[in-house]
Amino acid sequence: MRTTGSVLAVVPARAGSKGIPGKNLRTVEGRSLVRRAVESARRATRIDQVVVTTDGDAIAAEAVAAGAAVVRRPPELAGDEASSESALLHVLDAMSTPLPEVLVFLQATSPFIDPADLDAAVARVVDGHADAVFAAAPSHAFLWRTAPDGTAIAVNHDAATRPRRQDREPEYRETGAFYVMRTAGFLENRHRFHGRVELAVVDGAGAIDIDDEADLALAEALAEAPGEAPGAPTDARVGAPAPAPTTTRDPSPTRATPAPNGAP
């Protein structure tokens, strides 16, 4: 791994999952979700190293087979209450090499991450246009919420002068597929959204997030439909021998504090 201007991709993949047991090892088009994430990152030309952080032996073995290094996550950072940020901070603490300039956080639950989208997002950060870039899908949805008394309240539109859907400016839904950020800014702010934040607009299959069996079935159907989703990897980097595992050391307890949102 280069010591200057390097880009590290991290795929958090816990062994536990309430929605779909063993979710990160479930397959789409014959490849596990964690393998698909690793292979997408390895096909991106601007990513130098890929690390999977996990508490599961089977996931660790799958990650190495896919070409990633592995950082073993301690139990206190692998529960439902642990945050994604805590997993990323633990990986950075565990590294024996100088820290990367740019950190790419990928979620295995997004099975159709396009390497070209990763490269474009990394370029925005490396070239100084943004401090953080994340995947988001356009939406023209009319959103509502309910008041304590059950009354429906319009959130993102005026219900009395409801415009045509096609006339509305799109809003954007965070897909969770990937986040690209300056490592220094992430360490300083301890969250992924810092400085100037930009969107990497994705749509269609690229916006899918696997949360339940129906999502998995949809992803499988898209994978089998010609031209609907990215196919199997063909890049020479994928399938090459795995890099040497990342050397780990005891992480600083002050830099890996869990936050409220659950980690993958």
Predicted segment positions?
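Histidine-centered beta-alpha loop that forms part of the nucleotide-sugar donor binding/catalytic region
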Residues: R14, P75, A137-P138
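Short, polar loop motifs at secondary-structure junctions
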Residues: T54-I59, G185
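Short phosphate-binding loop-to-helix
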Residues: D57-V104, I113-A116, A120
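Conserved core of the sugar-phosphate nucleotidyltransferase
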Residues: S84-S86, S110-D203
